Amino acid sequence: MALIEPFRALRYDPSRVSIPQVVTQPYDKITPEMQDRYYAASPHNLVRVILGKQQSSDHAGENTYTRASQFFRDWRRQGIFLQDTQPALYLYVQRFTAPGGTAELERRGIIALGRIEDYSAGVVFRHEQTLAKPKADRLELLRSTRAHFGQLFMLYSDPAGEIDGLLKPGCDPDMDLRDQYGVWQRVWKLSDPSVIELVRSKMRDKKLIIADGHHRYETALAYRNERQAAGAGQTASTPRERSSSSASGQPGAQGPAPHDLVMMTLVNMDGPGLVILPTHRVVHGLQSFSSAEFRAGASVYFSVEEVDSSVDAARATVILREAGRIGTALLAVTPDRVFLLDRPKPVDPSFFTGWSLRQQALDVVQLHNCLLEGVLGISEEAVREQKNVRYIRDIGEAMAQVRSGAANLAFLMNPARMAQVRDIALAGEVLPQKSTDFYPKLLTGLTIYALE
C-alpha cells in the first residue's frame, strides 16, 4: 500500500530570487565545475546547502554540514523561502527532447510526501545497490538541516493513465523555467481536497520503484529508524490514522510523524515521457591491449562482426538500435577497429553465478561478466571502484576518448528497457552499477520538505 500525503512545501520566494538561478541538478550530478557556476549564480543558490564547498579550516564544529544548516536557517528567517499556507500536491511537468532524439516529449509527475517503508514490506522496490559513503554523507546533512531538498524519483504503474487524468491545473504554473539543458520545467500547486483524496486513493494499491535516489531513500529510512529509536513520534498504525494528517497538512498531528515521510515525485512508468539513456563504458589504464586479441576473446562469448572503423556517433547509435531489437548488442570501439558484438553464445551456467535469468538478459550483465571480467580481466571490485572503467553518457565523447588515445576501448550500449527494470526490481533483484540513466533529472529546490 503506497501511502502519500499532501504537504505545505517551503518554496523560494520569486520576489526575492530568480528561480532559475537558485535551483540545481541532483547533488550527485553536480560536478566541481557546476558547483562553481551555481555558487556564482546567486548567494542563495541551494548548492550551498546540498553540496557546499569544503574549506581547509573545517573541523567537527564547523564544516559543510554546519554551514548548510546555518544557510537554511538564515534563509528561512530572512524570508527567502516561503511556506505554502495550505497542504497540497504539486504537479511537475517536464518537456524536453532527449539527447540524440528529435521528438519533443512530456513527463508528468506528482510531488508529494510518501511513506517510508522497509523493502521487506513489498511497497517500495529498489533496482540498484547503494554505497555506504554517500549514505553517510546524506545522513549527516539530514541530521543537520532536518529537511529534504530534492525529490526521490519514484515510478508506479498506471497503463490507463487514470492518475494523470486527475491532474488538470487549469491555470498558469507557479514555477516556469528552462534549465541548463533546455528542459522546460513547470510546477503547479494542487490544493483541492477532493482531487488530493482521489489521487491518494488511486495510489494506495500501487507499488513504487525507485528510479533515482536510492541513497537518499535509504538515508531517509535510516533517519526514520534513528528517530523512532529515540522515541520521537510513533507511526500511525491504521489507514484512518494515517490519512488524518492530510486534513491539517501537518504530518505528525495524528498520522505519520514527519520523519516517517520523504518527498517524492511519482511518475507513471507506462507514460510516453519516460526515457532511459544508455551509459557507455570507457576502459582505460590497461597495461597492454590488442584489438586482435580482444576480438579473439570476445568471440568466445559473442558473434563478432567488424564494422567501418570510421563510424560516427549517429551511425553507431543506429547500428546498436537495429542489432538490439533481437537481443543483446554492444559496439566495442578500439583505437583502430570497431566491432559489433551480439547473439551471445552459450556459456557454463556457473559463469553467471548469483545472477538470475532476468538479470542475465541485460546487456550490461553480459558486458561485465563476459567482457570486462572474462576477456579483459577487470574484476568486479575494480569496476565498482572505477579503477579501469569510466561511465560516459555521451556516445561521441566515449568514442573520442578512445580515438584520442585517452582510453583503451569503449563499449557502447543500448539503454535498459523499462520492462527489464520493472521486472528485476519487483523480483527483489538489482541491476549492475550505472545500468540506468533516467532523463531528464528532477530539479532540486523546487519544493522543500522541512521536518520542523
Question: What are the residue ranges of the model-derived segments?
Answer:
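Surface-exposed, charge/polar-rich loops and edge strands
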Residues: 1-452
